[in-house]
Amino acid sequence: MEESAMTYENQKAWREIQTFLPKEYQYNADYKPTEEYWNWKGNNVHLDTFRNPDAKAKVICFHGVGTNGRQISMIIGGPLAKNGFETIMVDMPTYGMTEANPKMRITYADWVQCGSSLVDEELKKDVRPIFLYGLSAGGMEVYHVAAKNKNVKGIIGMTFLDQREKQVRMTTASNTFWGIAGALLAKLSCAIGFGGFKIKMSIPSKMKTLVNDRECLKIMMADSTSAGNKVTMQFLQSYVTYVPDIEPEDFSVCPILLTQPERDGWTPQFLSDSFLDKNKKVPVTKT
């Protein structure tokens, strides 16, 4: 670990969050991920990892716009590792413990490229199959990464939200104004030179439904590395207009699995259905 690198070792938020999880999901001295760092275009990208050279497959896990890599490592990365997989949880630039390159204005397109480059990096190490898992908005991100990279064996998403669709924006936005005008406002801000203006992601998005426990939500909303994070208008513009390298009608890279939460108050399944039902060339499983 680099001496000056940011680390979860002393971060308070995730430790408070894990108290809301069952005991077997909580980290301790004997059960916790290793923190790694990977340089991508001058971004010191933080990875939580459970390395296992005997694992037959790797799973790279992606957070959404209200979480970070440590949070998903607790609920999915660690449990998958216990079941014999090698898991890698990435903090995308501006989230978690990743130190963003100050010379870059990070966009959602950068997230997709970063994810694709991480797949390439892992494939350089060995030829074991790689699967992608995405939490919340990370579900659509893993589709975008797979469409760009084309070298993954399967994608798993909690949701698959195509923000280009008006119904998706209206349902997942914090209110009607942001649902109707958010994309236009972001575009206008970029056009007049305010693309670097930052707002909390909780302003345009329905972050109040991120988790169902009110006390846990307070902790996450106060955490500037996850639900309390700020993004630029340029990131927001890129997020709601991103065009995948392969549209769903032509996607033939790998099977898709939807793991829809039963009590999801933010992203109902019909939003994912509208996207997944367009995928006819690969097996699509919904749970």
Regions found by a protein language model. Name each.
Residues M1-N39, N44-R51:
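An N-terminal hydrophobic leader/cap segment in hydrolases
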Residues V65-G77, F270:
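The serine-hydrolase catalytic nucleophile loop
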Residues P79-A100:
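Conserved alpha/beta-hydrolase
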Residues G96-P129:
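Catalytic nucleophile-loop/oxyanion-hole region of alpha/beta-hydrolase
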Residues A137, E141-G228:
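Alpha/beta-hydrolase-fold enzymes
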Residues S252, L258-Q260, D264:
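Short beta-strand/loop motif that positions the catalytic acidic residue
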Residues G265-L271:
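Conserved alpha/beta-hydrolase "acid-adjacent" motif
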Residues D277-T287:
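Catalytic histidine neighborhood in serine/cysteine hydrolases
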